[in-house]
Each structure stands twice: as structure tokens, then as C-alpha cells.
Regions:
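Bacterial N-terminal signal peptides
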Residues: 6-15
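Carbohydrate-interacting/catalytic domains
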Residues: 17-55, 59-61, 66-83, 90, ...
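N-terminal structural segment of carbohydrate-active enzymes
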Residues: 26, 30-210, 218, 284, ...
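Aromatic- and acidic-residue-enriched segments that line the glycan-binding/catalytic groove
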Residues: 47, 63-84, 148-168, 217-261, ...
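Conserved, mostly hydrophobic/aromatic
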Residues: 54, 132, 142, 159, ...
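Short, solvent-exposed turn/loop segments enriched in Gly/Ser/Thr/Pro and often Arg
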Residues: 56-58, 140-152, 213-224, 311-316, ...
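Active-site-proximal helices and loops of the catalytic beta/alpha 8
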Residues: 201, 205-209, 218-219, 227-234, ...
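Aromatic-lined glycan-binding groove of carbohydrate-active enzymes
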Residues: 388-437
Length: 630
């Protein structure tokens, strides 16, 4: 459907868009979406932040003396430990096997990639907080930092201790932990890694950066204190009711120990649930660990984390989350709770009604943006507008403003690689696309570096991300121009200017690329500067953080979409964003009131006055971000 906004061969911005038959189109989206804090349950600070996701093992090695050992990774997938192992060189070619890996004789690449450890740690994060501050980041979401043998740490051995190899004294920490009674919080010590985590939180807070941890409360790992006790003591274990045990060792019955793992993965034993959610034993443990990190040593919430991201929240009963939210908000009413729920918006809605979570990792925003900006056959601006309106209007007031508007994460291919492979499948079909976007499962997946045109499309997404309703979230390294297929390739070591990176010569099949296809691995300084610019625009203009929203331009024929961010007082500062998603340059005309000034914050474009209108020309696949002041 086309909305008639064309006057004298140009697009005209109107306060309310009208189609050719004079009837309003997408009335929900045409109404102003307002942020009204007095009726909201969300923490107001969460509207104003720019998020950065850190995958600790791959972010920065700040202390080589604490690096993992072969013994420390036993229990992680793949379960069979290799004969030869070492910490992997940070700047090495991702698909090239090192000599120690070749010596193992393992034919499957994915097993090599999962066994690698690069040595990222909390000291590395502390060392790079100034970088994050200079980028404009004001909140960090950490993938799990708790004790675990894996690189991703979603197989927790403990929730009340930071992984010893993230801290300065791994062996000393392990000795202290071994003396505890996990069921008695009064016996829990503060290890050197725990103390470093508290220091990291304080250093972040000094820079006005909020911190949230990843809570993996649906399951633990096979190395967990509780599960190991069940394996050892079977039916006599005090933890036997924590997990879903299918059978115990019983020679008389001829049964062997067996348990249920998350999605069939035996290395991730699931907690048992009843009608109230996770049963009382693990529930009490989770609650105690929650309090520990939110109000450490009972010194005050200012010393603790500012909230949680909850892994696979959809696998845990609603009643558990309702109880857990009450606990969290009783500790810190301003804590932010965000959930991983990758599903249709109407399936997400029950979790975001005020009694469970404040927001979500907004994958539906990424799906919708993909369909408009990246898909080979893009949806029309009118459909894009309607889908965005659903995401704004489906939830209670304030939720859309605190949803984490991301593109990629540790569970998806990087945005640059997604654009390179934009025709491989439907991103919204999460399960199927997950496999299609893994190089190991799709031999047609292109693992090359994005070219200049593809990077320009990434920038176009960033423009939308930084100006639209919701809190932007950047996956570590996207701002540097990192690329990679889905897990595990999306978890490459971070690019830093003081580390030398060899060229990517090898392909996933072990073959060398033709010389013309070799990719130089380096920081994309132009892309980094663009991220800094767009983040600064968002941080400097409160209207982009908390302002109301209104769609103002929809033209399906010309591929142009525009919206306005403004305060409740129309005389306040306004920002208009116009996206030209077509393959052609477009001229747009905007009405100009007397004494109004227009400034393009993004481009050094020239605007021409034509009576009561301002005209500007927007290049193909680009946008304008206009500041309008009285």
C-alpha cells in the first residue's frame, strides 16, 4: 500500500500520514507512543543506557598468569579431553589448526573450536573499561562469569563464585571453595576472583556504567557441586531432588544412573520443577546467590550488580520468576531484569506484564530490521511500520523503552556476516536459521569479511538502532568490524590495536583460500568511528532515550520510512529520522515552521529552503537524522 506523500516530485512530511483514499493507515503506529514514568514498573535508568555485551573468555586477557589449564576444562563439551592442549594464540587464524591441535588427530573442526581457550578474564575487562567509556557505553551485560569448565559458562558449577580462572589466584580459590558447605551461605567465602568481580563492578560504576550478570537458573553443569554429589551418593545425596533423575545405579534392578538434560544435552542437567517452578532446594540456593551479588557483604546495593539477564527464561515456570522478581526488587527496586525469550511477540508478552521481567533481549526487533534492511526481497515500509508498532504497543508502558534492541549475540551470526549471507534463510525461524548460519552445518555459508557496501548496511542498521525506541545493545567487537558465522564462530577473540592478527587464510574445511580471497584481520576504524558518532548522538539527546514516538513518512513505492522522536511539549527539541531503503537517491521535503532550525546530525548535507519547506536529498540505502529546534 502506498501513502500519498508526493508533492512536486518530492516526498512531503505531514503531521499525520494519509493514503490516497484519505483513510488513515496503520492507526496504531500513527498515534504517538509515549513514555509515562508514573505508571511504569520498569527502572527509568534502563531507558537511557547503551548496552554492550561482553563474552568474558574472548574479550581481553588481562592476566596471563591465571589462564585456563587442561584440567580446568574437563567436564565441558566435547566431553573427551584432548591429549594435547594449550592456551590458544589470541591473534591466530580462526580456522587454522595449531600444531597441538593437529597432534590430537581430531577430524571434526567444531571440537577443536570448543576446546580452545584464549584466556579472557576480569582483569582484561577492567583494563578496557576506559575504552568502553570512550565508545559511549553506559551498561554492560556479561555472559556468565560463574565457575564453569566451558568457554561459555552456561554449564555452571556454582552460582555463588566467579570462575577462578577469571581471577588472580585460581588454585587458591579452588582450595577455599572446597572447604565450603554449598547449602550454608554463611560458609561461603569471597575468593580472589569474587573480589576482583566486585572491583570490576565498582570501576564500572565510577565510569557511570551499569553492570548486569547472566543468570542461568534452568540448569547447571555436570561439574556442579550438587550434581557431582548426586552422582557420588546417588539416592543418599541431599541434592537428589534438585534434578530430574530418571534412574539411579541399582545392580539388583539392573539400572544405571541417568538424568534429563536441557534439550537432551546430558552435560546440562535440568532442575526439577513443580507447580511453583524450580523446587525448593535449588530455589533457595538461587535466591541466596542472587542476594550475594546484588548486595555483596551486605554493604549496600551500590556495591552489587544492577540487574540480571535470565537465560532460557521460557523454560522456567512463570511462578518461579514471579517469586524471584519479588526478591530482586526487595533488594534493589531499581534493578533491571531482562529475559531471553526468542519467540513471537504474543508469546513473549506474558513475561513482560510487570510481575516477572522488565524487558527482553529484543530479537524480534532484529528480525524486523532484517526483513526491511537486509533481506534480498525487503518488506515494504508500511509492513515494517506495522511490525514495529506491534512491538511498541503489545507491552505495558515503558517496556518498549527498556527492551534491549540488539542485532546479534553469542547465539547468532555477527551482523556483518548476516548481511553477507542475507539470502540463506528466515532469521525469524530461529531454530532452522541457527543451523543455516553455522559454517559447520552449511557449506554454502560465506565466512569472508564484509565488503564496503555490506558494512554500509550495518551502519544503516546502527542509525535505526540508536534512534528508535528501546535501549541499543552492541555485541562485543561488532563496532570493530568483526565477522563470523554462528556459534562458535561468533565468539572469536576481540580485536585490539596492540595485538597482531594474522590474515584469515583457512576455510572451515581446512583448505587454504585463493590468494584473492584472503581476509586481512584488522580494526575497521571507519566503522568504529561511526559507532562512536551514533552512540554520542543518542547519549547527547534525551529525546532519543525517553522521548515519544510517531511515524511520519511511509512510502512503499519509494522505500522511504520516517519517524519523529519528541517530548510531550511540542516546542521541545525534536529529532526526525528518515531512512531511504531504496536503491536510488530520494528527495524529501519537510514542513518548516517560522524560526525553526534544522541540522543534520549524521551527514554534512545541504538543505534547501523552499517556501514553507526544507528539502534534503538522501542517498540510496542511507538515512538522515535531523535535529529540529525552535
Amino acid at each position: 500500500m502506498k501513502i500519498a506523500l508526493i508533492i512536486a516530485l518530492s516526498l512531503i512530511f505531514l503531521s499525520a500520514c494519509q493514503p490516497q483514499d484519505g483513510k488513515p493507515t496503520h492507526s496504531d503506529s500513527q498515534q504517538s507512543d509515549k513514555s509515562d514514568s508514573k505508571d511504569e514498573f520498569v527502572p527509568q535508568w534502563a531507558k537511557k543506557v547503551v548496552w554492550y555485551q561482553i563474552f568474558p573468555e574472548r574479550f581481553r586477557d588481562g592476566d596471563p598468569t591465571n589462564n585456563p589449564t587442561l584440567e580446568s576444562i574437563i567436564g565441558a563439551d566435547p566431553q573427551v579431553p584432548p591429549k594435547h592442549w594449550r592456551v590458544h594464540p589470541w591473534g591466530s587464524d580462526w580456522y587454522q589448526l595449531q600444531d597441538y591441535e593437529k597432534a590430537n588427530g581430531e577430524p571434526e573442526l567444531w571440537k577443536h573450536l570448543l576446546r580452545r581457550r584464549y584466556g579472557g578474564d576480569l582483569q582484561g575487562v577492567i583494563d578496557k573499561l576506559d575504552y568502553l567509556q570512550s565508545l559511549g557505553i553506559t551498561a554492560i551485560y556479561f555472559n556468565p562469569v560463574f565457575y564453569s569448565p566451558s568457554l561459555h559458562k552456561y554449564d555452571g558449577a556454582s552460582y555463588h563464585h566467579i570462575d577462578p580462572h577469571f581471577g588472580p589466584d585460581p588454585e587458591g580459590d579452588k582450595a577455599l571453595i572446597a572447604k565450603e558447605n554449598p547449602l550454608d551461605p554463611d560458609s561461603w567465602v569471597w575468593t580472589s576472583a569474587d573480589e576482583l568481580a566486585l572491583k570490576m563492578i565498582q570501576e564500572a560504576h565510577k565510569r557511570n556504567i551499569r553492570v548486569i550478570f547472566d543468570g542461568v537458573f534452568n540448569h547447571m553443569g555436570i561439574n556442579s557441586f550438587a550434581f557431582q554429589d548426586v552422582v557420588k551418593n546417588q539416592q543418599k545425596s541431599p541434592y537428589k531432588d534438585w534434578f530430574i533423575i530418571d534412574s539411579f545405579d541399582d545392580p539388583e534392578k539392573g539400572t544405571q544412573f541417568s538424568h534429563t538434560g536441557w534439550f537432551g544435552n546430558k552435560s546440562l542437567p535440568e532442575f526439577r520443577e513443580d507447580s511453583n517452578g524450580i523446587v525448593s532446594g535449588p530455589k533457595a540456593y538461587i535466591f541466596n546467590a542472587t542476594n550475594r551479588w546484588m548486595n555483596p557483604k551486605n554493604k549496600g546495593v551500590e556495591y552489587g550488580i544492577d540487574g540480571w539477564r535470565l537465560d532460557v527464561a521460557y523454560n522456567v515456570h512463570h511462578n518461579f520468576w514471579k517469586d524471584w522478581r519479588k526478591l530482586v526488587k526487595s533488594i534493589n527496586p531499581e534493578a533491571y531484569l531482562t529475559a531471553e525469550i526468542v519467540d513471537k511477540p504474543e508469546k513473549v508478552q506474558p513475561y513482560l506484564m510487570g510481575d516477572e521481567f522488565d524487558g527482553e533481549m529484543n530479537y524480534n526487533f532484529a528480525f524486523t530490521a532484517t526483513e526491511f534492511l537486509f533481506n534480498p526481497v525487503a518488506i515494504k515500509p508500511s509492513e515494517f511500520d506495522a511490525k514495529l508498532a506491534t512491538l511498541r504497543n503489545l507491552y505495558p508502558s515503558g517496556v518498549a523503552y527498556v527492551n534491549q534492541n540488539l542485532f546479534g549475540s553469542h547465539d547468532s551470526n555477527r551482523i556483518g556476516s548476516h548481511i553477507v549471507n542475507s539470502g540463506i534463510g528466515n532469521f525469524r525461524n530461529w531454530g532452522k536459521y541457527f543451523g543455516l548460519s553455522q559454517a559447520a552445518n552449511n557449506p554454502d555459508y560465506q565466512v569472508r569479511k564484509p565488503n564496503e557496501q555490506e558494512t554500509r548496511l550495518q551502519k544503516l542498521f546502527v542509525i535505526l538502532q540508536m534512534t528508535y525506541v528501546g535501549a541499543p545493545m552492541i555485541y562485543y567487537g561488532d563496532e570493530m568490524g568483526m565477522w563470523g558465522a554462528n556459534d562458535p564462530d561468533t565468539r572469536k577473540p576481540m580485536l585490539w590495536p596492540d595485538i597482531h592478527y594474522v590474515d584469515e587464510i583457512y576455510l572451515p574445511n581446512g583448505q587454504k583460500r585463493p590468494e584473492s580471497m584472503i581476509d586481512k584481520v584488522e580494526i575497521n576504524s571507519g566503522l568504529l568511528a561511526f559507532y562512536k558518532k551514533m552512540i554520542a548522538i543518542r547519549n547527547q539527546h534525551a529525546v532519543l532515550q525517553t522521548g515519544d514516538y510517531e511515524t511520519i513518512i511511509i512510502d512503499d513505492d519509494k522505500g522511504v520510512f520516517g519517524f519523529k522522536r519528541f517530548g510531550q511539549n511540542d516546542q521541545q527539541t525534536q529529532i526526525i529520522v528518515i531512512i531511504n531503503n531504496s536503491e536510488f537517491e530520494q528527495t524529501v521535503s519537510l514542513p518548516k515552521e517560522q524560526d525553526q532550525s534544522f541540522k543534520d546530525l549524521l551527514n554534512e548535507s545541504r538543505m534547501e529552503e523552499n517556501g514553507e519547506f526544507i528539502q534534503l536529498t538522501i542517498p540510496a540505502k542511507w538515512a538522515s537524522v535531523l535535529l529540529i529546534q525552535p
